[in-house]
Amino acid sequence: MQWFGGNVATAIQISRKNKALLIVYITTDSEDGQIFDGFWQHIDSSNLLCAVVGIKLKAGETSAQQFADIYPTPILPAAYLIDQNGKPLEVITPLVGKTYDQFRAKFDKATAQFVNGMPTAAANQLSTPSPSPAPVQVPASTDAPIPAPTPVTAPIQSSSTSQEMTRELAEKVARAKALLEQKKQKDAEKKREADKHVKEEMTKAREAKQERDAEALVKAAKQRKMEKLAAESDKKRILAQIKADREAAQKKFGKLVNTENASENTEKKQETTVGKAVPSDRCRLQVRLPDGSTFVEEFPSNDVLNSLVEIIRQKPSIAGTTFEIQQPYPRRIFTNDDYSKTFLENQLTPSTALVVIQKSSGSSSNYGSFSLSTQTVSFVTWVLYPLTAFWNIFCGMIGWNSTGKQQDSKSKKNDGPSTSGQSGSQPQRRGMPRSAEVRRRGNVAGLENPNEDDPEERASFNGNSTQFM
């Protein structure tokens, strides 16, 4: 393929002037660009159905960018086959022309479409090959004027030749259509096979997932069952270990008894049994007296309790009173019979705490002595009464008024506290005259002025300052 050396605008003008097919090829440095360059080298422009004007552009150049503004070129390399009206008849890219056969089929289809779209006379003229075609040479500089190409003259062929060419072109077109139809059918079949394969794969994947889920559920159920069995076995083992430890402990301390009998005995037994005394040589006692003081004494175990009683009687707070000795726990009150028993017999060994409690007989004896002293004083007063009478008569005869003095002193004593009490209990109120006297009867108070004898001044008022008769 021989390429035009000018720019795109000049190539368009020449193609329209010569009624030729315009080919714009945009190449790249990639592998696809090199393949397309090889395809164009196999095409002989002198052996085509119509005249062509081809221009080769480099991707990234200014001319290629200007052409891309009119005809977008998203995929490169690309070849645009454009008719006289500027309409692309075919766009050949690596997507549709990966092999030379595909590339040539697209190219032949575009040339045939270009020839069929032209008038018959022009088509016959263009379809007749020239004996010595000469490519149009244009200088590389775009500033120089481009001379018009020399028109190619071809001898007029016979009608049989034109019919053969038309028939050959129709056969090529039919063959190209058949190939395209076969290709479409093959592509559709491949697509159906691919869709079928995808559906089969999806079905297999779904079935495999369901199987995996079912296996996971079965495995989880088995795992839970095993865990449950393990937990039950551990529980039984722990209970058995606890039971064995309990039996061992009971055997060790001699307390292996029946559980049911022990519970029944525990419910029935409400009183605490008193343990037996521990035999010992000495008995240590802590005694608490009624005043709160305590003391500690130690006796031989074979000594009697009366020894402790004698020591308690010598205490100052107990001297001259009656008392009794009690044991707080277990609760016990010692009697006179217990005083003659030993500490061991009274179960007080080796040590015990005792409490001394005073009896109420001491208060009755004091009351009796108090009544006795009162009777004695009354008797003495009755005996001395005549002497007192004679003394008062003698003092009256002499002029000594002992009774009056006593009465005056008594009255002074009585007046003093009462006056002070009244003055203290009734302080003087602000705004009231000293001569005013208040008469109060319950919740009713009356004001009286001793200096004036006015009935209105003796008016009575209740607690709400309301006057009433």
From Swiss-Prot:
Topology of the protein relative to the lipid bilayer: Peripheral membrane protein
Region feature Disordered, mapped onto this chain: 181-212, 404-469
Domain of life: Eukaryota
UniProt tissue specificity: Expressed in the germline.
Keyword annotations of the record: Coiled coil, Endoplasmic reticulum, Membrane, Unfolded protein response
SMART domains listed in its UniProt record: UBX
Domain UBX as annotated: residue spans: 278-356
Intramembrane ranges, chain numbering: 379-399
Any Gene Ontology biological process: response to unfolded protein
Pfam family, one: UBX7_N
Any one GO cellular component localisation term in the record: endoplasmic reticulum
Biased composition (Low complexity): 416-430
Induction field: Induced upon ER stress. Down-regulated upon heat stress.
Subcellular location: Endoplasmic reticulum membrane
Keyword Transferase listed: no
InterPro entries given in the database record: Ubiquitin-like_domsf, UBX_dom
Keyword Protease: no
Observed effect of gene inactivation: RNAi-mediated knockdown causes a reduction in lifespan. Induces ER stress characterized by the expression of hsp-4, the accumulation of ubiquitinated proteins and an increase in ubql-1 expression.
Primary localization class, coarse: endoplasmic reticulum
Coiled coil: 162-214
Cytoplasmic domain ranges by topology: 1-378, 400-469
Quaternary structure and partners: Interacts with cdc-48.1 (via N-terminus) and cdc-48.2 (via N-terminus).
Function, in words: Probably acts as an adapter for ATPase cdc-48.1 and/or cdc-48.2, conferring substrate specificity. May play a role in the ER-associated protein degradation pathway (ERAD) possibly acting as a platform to recruit both ubql-1 and cdc-48.1 and/or cdc-48.2 to the ER during ERAD.
Free-text domain note: The intramembrane domain also contains the signal for ER targeting.
PANTHER family: UBX DOMAIN-CONTAINING PROTEIN 4
Protein name: UBX domain-containing protein 4
Native source organism of the sequence: Caenorhabditis elegans
